[in-house]
Amino acid sequence: MDISYEAFFRSLTGVAQATKAASNEIDTIKQLLSPGNEGSETKTKSASLSFQDWQVIIQQNVTKMTETTIHIALVAVAMSFLRETARQNQPATADDISQCWTIIRDALTSTTSSQTHFTASRSAQGFLSVPLCSLVKDGSIDELIRLHVWMPDGKRGNPDFHLHSHQPFAQSWILAGQGVDHSYEVDPVEDPAEATHAGYALAWNDGKGANTAYKTHQASSTVQNTGKLFRAVKIHTEAHARGSTYTVPAAEFHVSEVAPDALHATIFFFDSHRGFVKDAGVLGPKDGDSFTQLRDPAGVTPAELAEAVYQARLREELD
């Protein structure tokens, strides 16, 4: 899978947004790795490099980069690989995913790159997430790649709001543990007796105010009962373990289930280029009003999440 310069620089912008990287750090990477300046033979703007060659070129420039910029650049390469592989419907091998995971883990656990601000937050679905690459367009997710980790801590979110959908198409690559995905057919109804749920509208708050514009770094999210009634029927259940991948179409309602005492980790890619539905929402109790999920991870750091996933993968390899 070749990665173009355009694809790499697009990912670099997304990683900068996800990590709140300083503009001078991103400028340094762009200058060093632009076509013709990357330490190898002159390239044209249309040139592409393999996943491996991108890593080699970054390593050739390590003396001109800080550890922070090295990690940012490598994560951008990994994000580019995942995006291009997914969009071209190409399978990513176990070795490919392991390489991407190693790059991510090294970045999250680096002790000297203090200026790279990876952050963890608690999802309404119970898992902890770390944004790795985020591109928002007109207030909606354009591309978003995150690390999702369900810790063996019993925290699985508010079960009243587990049935949800995503605005963008989504793809997940399983890193460790097992999860079960339940798909639902959801139809609007008028009769309250037929309804199983009510529809809820979602708003995000970044500490400056709440609205329907998506925010990469959130303080909380709130769902509000719309008064619209729906009937949800489970139509498919599928278990996913390490080495597998699955997709969730835009606006398809589903529930992700992970045992409360188990660890489960995925790389999750929200991709509006493969589908986007603006009014995708959440379902909840018919007689409910609203619910707010605080994003506070209660002190859990991205480094701790990465280490927990690393240890889980080691145990799986020994089993």
Feature roles, as predicted:
Residues 38, 43, 47, 51-146:
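A short, N-terminal "cap"/entry segment at the start of jelly-roll beta-barrel domains
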Residues 181-182, 248, 254-260:
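Short beta-strand His + acidic residue motifs that chelate non-heme Fe in jelly-roll/DSBH
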Residues 1-31:
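Intrinsically disordered, low-structural-confidence terminal and linker regions
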Residues 5-10, 282-319:
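Extended, charged low-complexity segments
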Residues 185-250:
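Short acidic-glycine-tyrosine-enriched beta hairpin
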Residues 171, 261-278:
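A short hydrophobic beta-strand segment most commonly corresponding to one strand
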Residues 165-181, 185, 269:
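Short, conserved beta-strand element in jelly-roll/cupin
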Residues 113, 146-164:
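Conserved short histidine dyad/triad with adjacent acidic residue
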